[in-house]
């Protein structure tokens, strides 16, 4: 019945039933009181669709609260898919996606480090065709927090459980979206978040958890998956991209026998060290983008961590306002892919990852008026917003994601694995290899996919609704580098069309 309020043409009987439901429930399917965002500092004019934001408490006893920001679809929010977006890290805020990738606005720097950015409508926002939920997860990330600091010791499985609890409570708050198709999407370390959360959602559906979520599938971009596939992807990628010579590649291939990330043989170790030195000057998030190299590296404090001053230089993307100077998701050094046990914070591995800064997002999200407008706790209450935090003690305890992908797709849940083909952080070579390893038959042979008459990448379709796709010229965060192409494959895939 809540659907009827979104569209004209309701029958008199339906309208009467709606009024009765509203009278009995005190609001029916409406969003929770006080959740609507009516305006945003830095943006002039009416919002292009309804926005909502706030907290969902996933543990009352500990006061563990997850922050969300919802952007209703600009097309038909009553029917369009609902998509939960998760950034990676672990420990990185999903406002990364909102500000720098596929949110409703393009952010233009205000001119100085702390000045309020100007917001302009993004013609390639994913909210053009879907309702987006941006979730900061787990607690301690972005604007999410807990009153019990022990909650900041967490891992894959606990994060998935909390995120599932969030979803069940969120759909209770927004029941008008229960019949919409629901998808989970993310990038980088969300290559772990997405399948583990999808597994929890499916398990909940099968176990009778209420409300019943209309889960249809998931999306993973340049995502972490498996220690062996991820760890061995970089050397073939570097060779294919012309970063290392045939001779160097053959030396590594012969001495390492394909096991590049866990070199134990002396000759293999020498070969890998040579490759590391050759690629060390590149922007790992997009090998085409520039990096600043200073003769003397100065150190700057960020919270309780130290980062080289060289992380402050500007790269370029296809965004109209090139305000992003930090490409941050998760940069795994060649010999340190995700494996069982504690995952180092991004600050601990950052010394090998140049080209970093996030002043625009920080200036906006730490502005008192913005915090008030989006119903977030103040800086004085929960601290400043950080793109990626180091307060978590995070454990990778879910193992390889291959079994998760196999289980989900074999049950009929659609999936697309997409990769920016110039990302050296999580190279497409690894994603393509593990996708093939699932053993599904090919139903749409490898071919280019087209946007505006131009090749935008390559794709291959498999049985059980599985699709693999590359995005030509894109880096680690695909919608940031190639917003138009990203919107094209996203909208086509959601609609069930071929890329």
Swiss-Prot record:
Which protein family is it in?
A: Belongs to the peptidase S10 family.
Entry protein name: Serine carboxypeptidase 1
InterPro entries xrefs: AB_hydrolase_fold, Peptidase_S10, Ser_caboxypep_his_AS, Ser_caboxypep_ser_AS
Instruction: Give GO BP annotations, semicolon-separated.
Output: proteolysis; secondary metabolic process
Molecular-function annotations in GO: acyltransferase activity, transferring groups other than amino-acyl groups; serine-type carboxypeptidase activity
Task: List the GO terms this entry assigns under cellular component, sorted alphabetically.
Answer: extracellular region
The UniProt PTM text for this protein says: The linker peptide is endoproteolytically excised during enzyme maturation.
Top EC group: hydrolase
Which positions are catalytic residues? 188, 423, 476
Which cysteine-cysteine pairs are annotated as disulfide bonds in the entry?
92-388, 256-268, 291-355
Maturation propeptide residues: 297-351
What this chain does, per the entry, is described as: May be involved in the degradation of small peptides (2-5 residues) or in the degradation of storage proteins in the embryo.
What span is annotated as the signal peptide, if there is one?
A: 1-30
What EC number(s) are associated with this protein in UniProt? 3.4.16.5
Q: Where in the cell is it found?
A: Secreted
The record's subunit annotation is: Carboxypeptidase I is a dimer, where each monomer is composed of two chains linked by disulfide bonds.
Write out the residue ranges of the motif Microbody targeting signal.
497-499
Task: Indicate whether NADP appears among the record's keywords.
Answer: no
Xref: Pfam families: Peptidase_S10
Q: Which UniProt keywords apply?
A: Carboxypeptidase, Disulfide bond, Glycoprotein, Hydrolase, Protease, Secreted, Signal, Zymogen
Highest taxon, organism lineage: Eukaryota
């Amino acid at each position: 019945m809540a659907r009827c309020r979104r569209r004209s043409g309701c029958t008199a009987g339906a309208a009467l039933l709606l009024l009765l439901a509203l009278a009995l429930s005190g609001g029916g399917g409406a969003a929770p009181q006080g959740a609507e965002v009516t305006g945003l500092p830095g943006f002039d004019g009416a919002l292009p669709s309804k926005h909502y934001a706030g907290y969902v408490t996933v543990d009352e006893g500990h006061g563990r609260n997850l922050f969300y920001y919802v952007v209703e679809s600009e097309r038909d929010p009553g029917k369009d898919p609902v998509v939960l977006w998760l950034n990676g890290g672990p420990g990185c805020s999903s406002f990364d996606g909102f500000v720098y990738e596929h949110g409703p606005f393009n952010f233009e720097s205000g001119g100085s480090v702390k000045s309020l950015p100007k917001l302009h409508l993004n013609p390639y926002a994913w909210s053009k065709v879907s309702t987006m939920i941006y979730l900061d997860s787990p607690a301690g990330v972005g604007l999410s927090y807990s009153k019990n600091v022990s909650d900041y010791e967490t891992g894959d499985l606990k994060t998935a459980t909390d995120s599932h609890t969030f979803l069940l409570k969120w759909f209770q708050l927004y029941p008008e979206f229960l019949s919409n198709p629901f998808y989970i999407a993310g990038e980088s370390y969300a290559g772990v978040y997405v399948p583990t959360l999808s597994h929890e959602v499916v398990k909940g559906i099968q176990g009778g958890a209420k409300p019943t979520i209309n889960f249809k599938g998931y999306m993973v971009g340049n995502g972490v998956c498996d220690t062996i596939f991820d760890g061995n992807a970089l050397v073939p990628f570097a060779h294919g991209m012309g970063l290392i010579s045939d001779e160097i590649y053959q030396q590594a291939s012969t001495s390492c026998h394909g096991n590049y990330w866990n070199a134990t043989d002396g000759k293999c170790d020498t070969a890998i060290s040579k490759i590391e030195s050759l690629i060390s000057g590149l922007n790992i998030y997009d090998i085409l983008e520039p990096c600043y190299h200073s003769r003397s590296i100065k150190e700057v404090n960020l919270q309780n961590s130290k980062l080289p001053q060289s992380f402050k230089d500007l790269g370029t993307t296809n965004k109209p306002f090139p305000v992003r100077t930090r490409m941050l998701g998760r940069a795994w050094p060649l010999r340190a892919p995700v494996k069982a046990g504690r995952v180092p914070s991004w600050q601990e591995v950052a010394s090998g990852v140049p080209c970093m800064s996030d002043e625009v997002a920080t200036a906006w999200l730490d502005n008192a008026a913005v915090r008030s407008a989006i119903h977030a706790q103040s800086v004085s209450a929960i601290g400043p917003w950080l793109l990626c935090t180091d307060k978590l003690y995070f454990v990778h305890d879910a193992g390889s994601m291959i079994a998760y992908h196999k289980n989900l797709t074999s049950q009929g849940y659609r999936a697309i694995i997409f990769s920016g083909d110039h990302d050296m952080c999580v190279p497409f070579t690894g994603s393509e290899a593990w996708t093939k390893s699932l053993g599904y038959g090919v139903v749409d042979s490898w071919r280019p996919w087209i946007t505006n008459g131009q090749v935008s990448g390559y794709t291959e379709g498999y049985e059980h609704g599985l699709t693999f796709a590359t995005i030509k010229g894109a880096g680690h965060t695909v919608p940031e580098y190639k917003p138009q192409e990203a919107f094209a494959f996203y909208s086509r895939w959601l609609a069930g069309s071929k890329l």
